[in-house]
Amino acid sequence: KGLSGGRIVVKQPPEARRDPLANIIVGNTVLYGAISGEAYFEGVAGERFAVRNSGAVTVVEGTGDHGCEYMTGGVVVVLGETGRNFAAGMSGGIAYAYDPAGRFKDLCNAAMVDLEAVAAADPALAEDPEQPRQRSVTVENSGMGDPLRFDAERLRILVERHHMHTGSARARALLGDWENAVKRFVKVMPKDYRRALLEMKSERQVSRVAAE
């Protein structure tokens, strides 16, 4: 609870033969109230994963019920199944769920969020200074670039890091077929968060024009 920096890595023992996608590796309320830092879990988290997360970046291979409840910031990537009531009360941050079977819409609480397809990488944006290009070991900023853009790039970076830190077989498989895998992710975007970001962007544009 309350992670405020650093990195947490929890992975399967080398001799383990169990399937990480069916194995609960961390318990309930992990990353509750986290404000910064990063965490990678090679397995499934229990209930209320990343509740009230306000800035941590994390990858996990499945969650129990009520994941990302009341989340206000940060980035969460789920490479497996989620429980029910995902994103209830989520007002900020972004999440991505791998959803090859198309079941996530029935497990997500969509009262405050929109579910979107992940936008493909855009080569024309390669030189954009806001693009998340940090493929190094550390996360340079909790937002990882403009939350309204760069979904494919952001996702790939985090799946790469998850594989680097945990040796995850699921991450390796996704990266090996990334062109198809990225299309099976769903982005969870809070409605009020998007509106606030668009308003801030509009205000910055007006300020730049006025300065000219």
What do the predicted segments below correspond to?
Residues K1-E212:
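Long, distal/terminal scaffolding or interaction modules
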